[in-house]
From Swiss-Prot:
Principal location: cytoplasm
Similarity remark: Belongs to the RbsD / FucU family. RbsD subfamily.
Residues annotated as binding substrate: D28, H98, Y120, A121, N122
Top EC class for this record: isomerase
Originating organism: Bacillus cereus (strain ATCC 10987 / NRS 248)
Reaction catalysed by this enzyme: beta-D-ribopyranose = beta-D-ribofuranose
Entry keywords, A to Z: Carbohydrate metabolism, Cytoplasm, Isomerase
Function: Catalyzes the interconversion of beta-pyran and beta-furan forms of D-ribose.
Protein name as catalogued: D-ribose pyranase
């Protein structure tokens, strides 16, 4: 049994398989998941698990080079945006339109669906390297 890090076997496997610049998405319960992209559905009820809880655990276990967010989060979910900025200090933040964000999700290795039910609580994490 693992003692530290991500315990969910699907998430742990995806993180272990990421190469430099590969992406994963952590999403609220409303983000459409494109056909062909692996869905890891953690949602058990509205709000559980939260987007921020899942982001924290994944970010602690992943080398992140860049973070992509929908620019709409700035005005429509300032609290989530602020928390992302606080939790992910090192990587560069990139904002794109929500439509562009959804296009980018088509290239993700996986989308982790949370129970979050607040607008634009979605993030694309771009894998970095540990050296």
């Amino acid at each position: 049994m693992k003692k530290h890090g991500v315990l969910n076997s699907e998430i742990a496997s995806i993180l272990a398989s990421l190469g430099h610049t590969d992406t994963i998405v952590i999403a609220d319960c409303g983000l459409p998941i494109p056909d062909g992209v692996k869905r890891i559905d953690l949602a058990v009820e509205i709000g559980k698990p939260s987007f921020l809880d899942v982001l924290q655990v994944v970010a602690d276990d992943m080398a992140i080079e860049k973070v992509t967010l929908a620019e709409e989060v700035i005005n429509n979910n300032a609290e989530i945006n602020k928390e992302i900025e606080l939790k992910l200090v090192e990587p560069a933040l990139e904002y794109v339109s929500h439509e562009q964000f959804k296009e980018h999700t088509k290239k993700a290795k996986a989308i982790i669906r949370t129970g979050e039910a607040t607008p634009y609580a979605n993030v694309i994490l771009h894998a970095g390297v540990i050296f």
